[in-house]
Every structure is written in structure tokens, then in C-alpha cells.
């Protein structure tokens, strides 16, 4: 797993628009965070406030992104106005997105955090899981209380994630992942069976899984501010089952607030039913992780960065544009191991 990335999630029994509007108001951080207290408003989307992980104040800034399937925001933090070095994308997936046709009333809140390895402190990395997980619990309690609940609602699904650093340009990664003709190379549990159709935002096609069961795959890419969310739907028509696993790819220059940081973070978001094990599709988070490793290896080879793969799954300070291979010709992707 990528060392500079942390994600936490929670099911909240409220509607998507209510959750979105609440999160867009930075002043509401006063109510549910450990110690982010807004002191002075700078502009409609920016405040100066205290911080849970530092002994000094920070600027807090919010951006919004909209989609017809889900909603989301980004929180940005930094010590100077409009100079932000921490970014926190937040996604709100309605229950009907996780399970099409579901009668569950609620939203799955997914909070993604990046900490620049140049600026992070030991306390930030040692405390981020504890603090963000507890803050999610606080947010859930407030929003469900406002919705009339007197105890914590239990969602039908839980979210699990897998993140990895890819030493290749973001646009190459987005094109490669959305092109279903590449799926045979990196998705080892699927085999193409039939025609593929592609357009500029994705494609669809027919595949067989490891049990020779039919799988209709649909991929759709969405540009969200400075990163992409790539929807991946795997429909099993003979079993009336669909597995959704959105993929977020965000450039390291944005994730870490460093213009010289090269490559991108690949973050897989997966949904797992709480009441029964899956019988079709990917059955464990390691299946998604293995695919991510394949994508990393193949894309880094295409970008000419053949030394990065052996150094592990995480972004390191040495991975800057100053240390990139200048003038190197992209290598063709090799499909052999």
C-alpha cells in the first residue's frame, strides 16, 4: 500500500444533497472535527482556523465537484493563502450507486487524505488514522441525529481501498485504463470475449471470468478538477449481479502540493456487502491490489521508468521532474512477466 495515502469511510443515513451541502460549509468543521475551528473567513470558500495535527493555524479552502452519479468536494490546507500543501478529496456515493436499485436510504462518505513526505511530521502519520476515523464517527452522528436518528445506522456495505504510486504521466494512465483493449493485460481474472466499443470517455465490452461466466464491462472517465475518477462496472448478466469499483487517479503534484512531484496515485474504491460473501467478481481486496500492481508495472515501462517498480508501492521524495529521464523515448508496454 502507498505510505503517503490514507482513506477512511462511513455510511451515513441521510440524503446525498444534505450531506454535500453540510460538507461545503467550512464553518461546520467546528462541530465534528477534533480541533479544526474556523476563526476568520477570508473569502466565500476559505477560512483561517486551528488544526488538530499542528501547533499553528492553517488556511482551509473548499472546492466542489459535481456528477450525475455522485457528489464530492476537496478540502485544501496550507500555511499561506492560496498556497496549499494538503488536499483531501471527499466522495459521496448514494446507496443506489453502490447497489443499483437499492432501497437503502443513505450515502457512503469516503475521505481520501494525502500527506507530502517532505512536510509530514511523525505525529501526522501516527495520528491520522485515529483522528480521521473518529472524526468520521462524529460526522455520522451529527448528520444522523439531524435526520432524526437516536443510534448509529448500519450500512449494508463497507468500503475497502487499495492505493499505489505509478511513475508515469497522469494522462497516459487515464487513456490506458479507460481503453478496454488493455484489460486483458492488467486484469488477470478476465478474458476478452467479443467486440469492444470505445469513445473518448471510456468503453464497454464482453469478457469471461475465471469460471467462464459472462461479464459485461463498462468503463467511464470523469475529469474532476485536477484529477480523474474512472468508473468501472462489472455486470454478470446470468446472475443479476453488478460489482462497481471506482478508480481515482490524482497527480502527485496535486496530492502533495509540489509542482515537481511526478507520477500519480492510483486509488481503488471497493464496496463489500456486510451480510454475505461475494460469489462472483473479485472476492477480496488483494484481487484489486494485484491489478493495480500490474497497471503500475506496465505504465512505468511505457513511460521509460524501469527502475521505479522495484522500489515499492509508495511515492518518494526522489521522484521529481528534476530526476526524470529527460528525452527518454516511451517504451512499448511488455505483456510478459
Which residues does each predicted region cover?
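Hydrophobic ligand-binding cavity/cleft-lining segments
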Residues: 1-43, 141-198, 327-329, 335-337
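Glycine-centered tight beta-turn/hairpin loop motif at sheet-sheet or coil-to-beta transitions
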Residues: 3, 53-55, 80-82, 210-212, ...
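Hydrophobic pocket/interface hotspot
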Residues: 18-23, 29, 47, 62, ...
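Short, hydrophobic/aromatic-rich segments at coil-to-beta transitions
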Residues: 41-49, 66-76, 198-206, 223-231
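Central antiparallel beta-sheet cores of small beta-barrel/beta-sandwich binding domains
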Residues: 55-63, 215-220
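Beta-strand/loop substructures that line and gate deep hydrophobic ligand-binding cavities in soluble
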Residues: 76-141, 146, 231-301, 306-308, ...
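Charge-rich (especially acidic), low-complexity segments
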Residues: 153-154, 195, 217-221, 238-241, ...
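Structured core of small recognition/catalytic domains
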Residues: 188-195, 206-220, 224-226, 231-241, ...
Amino acid at each position: 500500500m502507498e505510505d503517503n495515502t490514507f482513506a477512511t469511510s462511513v455510511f451515513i443515513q441521510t440524503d446525498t444533497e444534505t450531506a454535500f451541502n453540510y460538507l461545503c460549509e467550512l464553518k461546520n468543521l467546528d462541530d465534528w472535527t477534533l480541533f479544526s475551528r474556523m476563526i476568520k473567513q477570508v473569502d466565500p470558500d476559505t477560512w483561517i482556523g486551528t488544526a488538530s495535527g499542528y501547533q499553528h493555524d492553517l488556511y482551509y479552502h473548499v472546492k466542489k465537484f459535481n456528477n450525475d452519479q455522485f457528489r464530492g468536494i476537496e478540502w485544501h490546507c496550507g500555511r499561506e493563502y492560496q498556497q496549499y500543501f494538503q488536499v483531501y478529496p471527499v466522495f459521496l456515493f448514494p446507496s443506489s450507486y453502490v447497489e443499483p436499485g437499492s432501497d437503502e436510504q443513505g450515502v457512503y462518505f469516503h475521505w481520501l487524505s494525502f500527506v507530502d513526505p517532505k512536510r509530514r511530521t511523525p505525529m501526522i502519520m501516527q495520528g491520522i488514522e485515529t483522528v480521521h476515523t473518529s472524526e468520521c464517527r462524529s460526522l455520522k452522528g451529527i448528520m444522523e441525529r439531524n435526520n432524526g436518528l437516536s443510534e448509529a445506522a448500519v450500512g449494508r456495505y463497507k468500503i475497502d481501498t487499495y492505493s499505489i504510486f505509478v511513475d508515469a504521466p497522469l494522462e497516459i494512465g487515464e487513456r490506458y485504463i479507460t481503453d478496454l483493449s488493455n484489460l486483458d493485460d492488467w486484469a488477470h481474472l478476465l478474458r476478452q470475449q467479443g467486440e469492444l466499443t470505445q469513445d473518448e470517455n471510456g468503453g464497454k465490452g464482453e469478457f469471461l471470468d475465471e469460471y467462464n461466466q459472462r461479464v459485461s464491462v463498462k468503463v467511464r472517465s470523469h475529469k474532476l478538477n485536477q484529477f480523474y475518477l474512472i468508473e468501472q462496472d462489472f455486470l454478470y448478466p446470468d446472475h443479476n449481479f453488478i460489482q462497481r469499483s471506482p478508480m481515482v487517479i490524482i497527480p502527485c503534484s496535486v496530492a502533495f502540493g509540489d509542482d515537481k512531484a511526478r507520477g500519480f496515485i492510483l486509488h481503488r474504491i471497493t464496496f463489500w456487502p456486510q451480510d454475505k460473501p461475494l460469489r462472483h467478481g473479485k472476492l477480496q481486496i488483494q484481487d484489486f491490489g494485484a491489478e493495480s500492481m500490474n497497471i503500475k508495472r506496465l505504465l512505468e515501462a511505457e513511460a521509460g521508468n524501469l527502475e521505479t517498480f522495484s522500489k515499492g508501492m509508495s511515492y518518494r521524495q526522489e521522484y521529481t521532474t528534476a530526476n526524470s529521464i529527460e528525452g527518454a523515448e516511451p517504451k512499448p508496454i511488455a505483456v510478459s512477466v
